[in-house]
Amino acid sequence: MFELELHPKWKKRLEEAKLTSVEALLQLDLQEKLEFLPGIGGGYYQVADDLRVFLYCDLQISWHRILRSFVMFQWPCSLSEREQRGIEMLHQAGFQIAEVMAWGNRKVLRLPRQGVLLLRALAGLPLPRFLRQELDEKVRRRTILAAEETLQALQEGGFFWPDCLPENFFVQADGSIALIHVHSVRRQRLNALQAQQQFEFFYSRL
């Protein structure tokens, strides 16, 4: 198994919770489990009353995925590593995003074979779930507008996010929008048509 690196800010809390190894993370009884691709998933876990986390697990990195990355002229990496890079990039750009608590990647000959990423879970709801629960039409419209403005800010900041699904816009307690599942985000300036297509993609799934 591979080593888990702890962010200094969260080292003490993770030690108290005995979550200092990859083995410990993989034994968590995760809630609200998600599967992004075969072998790639994650879920939530309540560490303490004031701390909920989200764990990404990428434990079956196939040779097909590695070869596909090379064909696309990209160096292969695990989904958890891409998520961590996306978080760091968007955090530096001023977007609201989850905090990285711990990470680990096992590589063979510099090629990724497994990866994990532990995040502090955001407090709030994915946009579609929020809209289903919110009865005030003004609040609903204001929240959708906030998500639209966030997507526009991404575009104006030079980011392309293929996974700009409504469920990846997270409505926080104060009504602000945070972003989740950002492993596909990359630096790319969009022309007017591409920007419009992104909004159409977002609206079609709202």
What do the predicted segments below correspond to?
Residues 1-34:
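Juxta-kinase regulatory segment immediately upstream of eukaryotic protein kinase catalytic domains
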Residues 22-125, 156:
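Conserved ATP-binding subdomain of kinase catalytic cores across diverse folds
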Residues 43-47, 55, 149-187:
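Active-site acidic catalytic loop and adjacent metal/ATP-binding pocket
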Residues 63, 106, 127, 170-175, ...:
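Active-site-proximal flexible loops/turns
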Residues 65-71, 129-133, 192:
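Short acidic, glycine/proline-rich loop/turn micro-motifs
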Residues 75-78, 135, 139, 190, ...:
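Short alpha-helix boundary/capping segments
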Residues 80-81, 86-97, 128-162, 166-167:
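Conserved kinase catalytic-core helix
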Residues 142, 172-206:
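C-lobe/activation-segment region of protein kinase-like
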